[in-house]
Amino acid sequence: MGLEGLIRNLVDVFPGTVGLVINDMVGGRSLCINEAERLPAASLIKLPILWECFAQQADGRVSRETRISLTNSRKAGGSGILQFLEPGVFLTFQDLATLMITVSDNMATNLLIDSLGQDCINSAIRGLGLGNTILQRPMMDFDSARQGVENVTTAADIAQLLAHFVRSDTLPAAARAHMIRILAQQQLNDRLSADWPEAIAFAHKTGSLPGIEHDVGILYPETRPLIIVLLTRTDPFSRAGVRLCREVGQLLYQEML
């Protein structure tokens, strides 16, 4: 049985919903399962925020030299370290973007949403052709979440966004390379890449909410970049999504790396 059959077997017995895309950027081959299924984005919504951050720096809408002050008004719990710092610390857009991705810092994310503009971020999302992705609330906004206001995306949209990171005419190559370097510094590596040797380059981002476990990124074997997107939704008290990510990662390592 080939890789596709092995992965489909895992998905078939998963106790929930899976959205998956594996796309060979050179050979053009792809595997898609429920790629149009709209799911809570969790921290994957930070990927289009990262894109818009670099886009606004590239076209001069914001300055690379600008320093943004930490304030208690944007304090956010969950993942990240900025919530533990005293107000008055100043950080650059690059500092905030790096923290938002590498340790999934929610406070850094909210500061970027404020500084870049939620409408601008959603305009960028539409401009990139991500028709099923939308930023509707900041991180850790539980009041909005209880009212059903959620950031959403699909595996197909995330795969398309990651393809823009690799090849795009809308952002300079240097900016795209910088974003990929930030993704490659990811500190949350308990899913797709959990059992891979450290030498394997994987520029990626995870996402988690109760019952939601995602891992998506750009894998760099010796010959070609691969886009890998795995989104899962299951019981809020289950870790089945993390297990599926690890199992798919093990198959990818055995069959492709």
Where are the language model's segments positioned?
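Mid-domain, small-residue-enriched loop/turn segments at the edges of structured enzyme/sensor domains
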Residues: 14-17, 111-162, 166
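Active-site SXXK
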Residues: 28, 40-68, 100, 228
